[in-house]
Amino acid sequence: FSAGHDIGTPGRDFHRSFDRRTLWYDHTNKAGAEKAYAREQEVYLGMCKRWRALPKPTIAQVHGGCIAGGLMLAWVCDLIIASDDAFFQDPVLQMGIPGVEYFAHCHELNPRIAKEFLFLGERMSAERAYQMGMVNRVVPRTDLIDEVRRVTDRLSAQPRLALQLAKQACNHMETLSGKEAGMDAAFGYHHFAHANNTIVKGDYIAGFDGKKMAEANKAQAEKSD
């Protein structure tokens, strides 16, 4: 039961000191799996979900490489506009992890294309991403900023509430199709992989570290060229 005054009465008890506790993860210094789980639940998956739920439309302006964490930040936006030299990639399988924390691959791409994207870890060009429906528009690099501004000007001229409700409706449809439930399940698999890597390799990341992965990606790109 709460009478409302349980949260404090202005002018009466504001002077009292309380031992304040946060209801959300606020630590990354605990032992074992809790450290990685708390950090990635809050900073990666949780943050991305909150960005996706913003009432205002968001646009990702992408040029160059959009890799791993960058991919998550682009995916949470409502629209993605990319330059023709942009590419997208989730290579973290090489680190012994089954994909980034915000696991939206099979909603952003056809499942078979998503599997190829994950299994091989290769770069997907902006044009290919556009063909697959992951990107809204591809323009020359020199035109990217102007194109994004044109779209934002159009959006700002739309009725605000209708735009907000349209976004909520689209997000709700995605949620009903299982997007969030799937991501939550994939997050569990992600941390099972971390735990397995810790037991087998002594580190929660197995295979390549960030530096080695960057070198491998560069070599792969040069070979493709």
Locations of regions flagged by a protein language model:
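Low-complexity, flexible helical/coil segments
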Residues: 25-38, 95-99, 115-121, 172-178, ...
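A broad, low-specificity signal for short, low-complexity segments enriched in glycine/proline
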Residues: 19-23, 42-43, 76-79, 97-100, ...
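Crotonase-fold acyl-CoA enzyme core
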Residues: 49-161
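Glycine- (often His-adjacent) and acidic-residue-rich active-site loop
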Residues: 1-46, 212
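Non-membrane alpha-helical structural segments and their capping/turn regions in soluble enzymes
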Residues: 34, 38-45, 142-145, 160, ...
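Polar/charged side chains located within well-ordered beta-strands of beta-rich proteins
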Residues: 40-41, 58, 190
